[in-house]
Amino acid sequence: MTASAPVITVDGPSGAGKGTLCKALAESLDWRLLDSGAIYRVLALAALHHQVDISTEEALVPLAAHLDVRFVSQNGQLKVILEGEDVSNEIRTETVGNTASQAAAFPRVREALLRRQRAFREPPGLIADGRDMGTVVFPDAPVKIFLDASSQERAHRRMLQLQEKGFNVNFERLLSEIQERDSRDRNRAIAPLVPATDALVLDSTSMSIEQVIEQALAYAQRILALPLKK
């Protein structure tokens, strides 16, 4: 890890637009990208590939510590590369999700993945997408953004996404699920979902994604005097 490499952290609840913003920032600045939300799924998939016993913390820790993963944004699409292979779709399966939940229960695995995430900090810089990037993982990041939106707006966005994929969805159920997750995330004892005290808080409820990207880029450039990728 190169502590002097700048980091832009983007935290916030699901559906606020963090992923889209982070991909745009990474492409505009030509920086590395970290999708912390995918880390446990990548670890789970690696464990399945290498037939590591997911019920044993001792077996998972070395795998977590040396996880060979990269996140690449190309034309607005995020690719998750595990050991040189594109696993963007594979990490989204139910089996991988269940395995990830088991792995996340181990304290030493969480600590190993925390160190692994910090190792992404390399020149020219890092865009870190998550929920506690600015408060826990990179508390010294020079640029911190907390991207929020109303629960109603986030439920509406999620409904449109699912409908585009051909799913019939109930708005009230989606809204209830989002509000329940918000409550858990904001009130948990360890690493609650809150803005860092020095974060720029952007409410995207009534903003287009283009406006969000423009404001975030302007803020980062003002603090870091960054050139845009040509």
Curated annotation (Swiss-Prot):
One Pfam family matching this protein: Cytidylate_kin
One GO process term, biological-process aspect: pyrimidine nucleotide metabolic process
Cell location: Cytoplasm
EC number(s) given by UniProt: 2.7.4.25
GO molecular function: ATP binding; CMP kinase activity; dCMP kinase activity
Gene3D superfamilies per record: P-loop containing nucleotide triphosphate hydrolases
Catalyzed chemical reaction(s): CMP + ATP = CDP + ADP; dCMP + ATP = dCDP + ADP
GO cellular component: cytosol
Binding, ATP: G12, P13, S14, G15, A16, G17, K18, G19, T20
Keywords for this protein: ATP-binding, Cytoplasm, Kinase, Nucleotide-binding, Transferase
InterPro entries, per the entry: Cytidylate_kin (IPR003136), Cytidylate_kinase_dom (IPR011994), P-loop_NTPase (IPR027417)
NCBIfam families with a match to the protein in the record: cmk
Similarity remark: Belongs to the cytidylate kinase family. Type 1 subfamily.
Protein name: Cytidylate kinase
Organism, as annotated: Yersinia enterocolitica serotype O:8 / biotype 1B (strain NCTC 13174 / 8081)
Gene: cmk
